[in-house]
Design a protein with these regions (language model features):
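Amphipathic interaction/junction segments at domain boundaries or subunit interfaces
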Residues: 39-145, 167-169
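Polar low-complexity intrinsically disordered regions enriched in Ser/Thr and small residues
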Residues: 26, 32, 41, 106, ...
Length: 182
């Protein structure tokens, strides 16, 4: 997929969300790790980044900020931090304000559209199992723990209480999560 229009990319808002989640001020080694990846936190983000670079960014920041966490928990915490950082971006504030008005149920209806502000490849199929109990299948997930953290923090931010987000199934690069709240 190198170089073509089918290349998976992550948009600036996603990189900006991670940067705002973790700095400044930067933990020792964080700024250097970013610069090594070609990301200068003092400069405006590029419009888009290759998915492979974003995965390296997640790994580097995760190891610096959550060094003692096992991998799945580290990425869960990264997903939660992503939402905290997203709330600090212009697009994030606007999007989360709208989603707070419509609540968790209708937020899930808009999931693919919301993820399209983050990247060019995420699709989500939603299935209602019962009121406030859903199954969400994502077509391409490299790090399920990260998605679980994003869903957890994102749904809490728009009003879901007593929330549970669990990985229900993993097939190739697809991942299915169950989500329920009160």
């Amino acid at each position: 997929m190198a170089g073509g229009q089918d290349e998976r990319v992550v948009f600036a808002a996603s990189v900006e969300a991670l940067l705002r989640a973790f700095g400044p001020p930067w933990k020792p080694g964080a700024r250097e790790a970013l610069l090594k990846l070609g990301i200068d936190p003092e400069q405006a983000p590029r419009a888009a980044y290759p998915l492979s670079l974003y995965m390296q960014l997640l790994a580097a920041l995760g190891e610096i900020h959550f060094p003692d966490a096992i991998e799945d928990e580290r990425y869960f915490q990264m997903g939660q931090a992503f939402i905290r950082g997203f709330e600090r971006t212009l697009i994030g504030r606007a999007q989360l304000s709208l989603l707070q008005l419509i609540g968790p149920r209708r937020t899930l209806d808009r999931l693919t559209r919301s993820f399209r502000n983050a990247n060019n490849y995420t699709t989500a199929n939603l299935r209602e199992l019962a009121p406030k109990h859903f199954e969400i299948e994502f077509g391409f997930v490299q790090i399920p723990g990260f998605y679980r953290g994003v869903l957890d923090a994102g749904l809490r931010a728009v009003g879901a209480n007593d929330l549970s987000v669990e990985l229900a199934k993993r097939e190739a690069l697809a991942a299915t999560f169950t989500v329920r709240w009160t």
